[in-house]
Amino acid sequence: MLCCLIKTPIKSCCVKALRFFIWCCFCLPAALQAKETLRMAMPDYPPYTYIQNGGYHGFGYEAFVSIMADLQQDFKIVPEPNYGRAVKDMQSQVVDGLFLASENEERNKVAVFSAAVAYTGWTWVWLKQRTDLKPDSISFKQDAVVSAQLNSNPYLWLMKQHYKVAGAPNNIRMLFTLLNSRRVDAIMLPELTAKAVMQQEKLDPSLYSMQLEMQLPFGIYISKAYIARNPDIMPKLNQAIMRYHEQQKEFASKPSG
């Protein structure tokens, strides 16, 4: 009888120890893997993402932070001067992703594009004095000298469509320098970015004409290398983006005051 009483707790302890060993072997690595910090490139692209007074700002940044909080995902922001630098860092695995961005073939080679967090409207901007310019005309495409931020998606699109592209700067604010000095006839960038730069640089909006060219999804890129280590990240991310939109709708529907 005493032998049986002794064996029972020993057996119970062995079972618990075995369960703990199995958890350490299979569950713990998965739990640790899920906590791998996301190193995210954030281009200087007002009003979506930018740095001001040493802090991160922009509604693209705020949306990203909200989505990561929903996922309970740790992240580290890596500020980038432009999209070209951000994509290179993603290609060399210096960062694990990029936000916010529109989709293109080059980025799709090394990363996966999420559901849309927002939409961006690529817009032509030109001096209002230039009444001869019609961006939707054949002559504009054939003759107008245009520009966009170097290696940005608008720049790559203009090159692919065989526009006469010149003087593409790394700094998006320099586009207006090119335009105001009449070194180019028109520039292309998102409408909200154009308005944000005008405000930051104290430019008079009444001096410019604007015309929407196209509207595209603005989302989050996660590198394929990171996904290989964390295969559940994209479905979870897309679900979190959907919940983010639902929360925004609920917030917008609430009466103010």
Question: What spans do the regions from the language model cover?
Answer:
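A conserved helix-loop-strand patch within extracytoplasmic ligand-binding domains
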Residues: 116-160
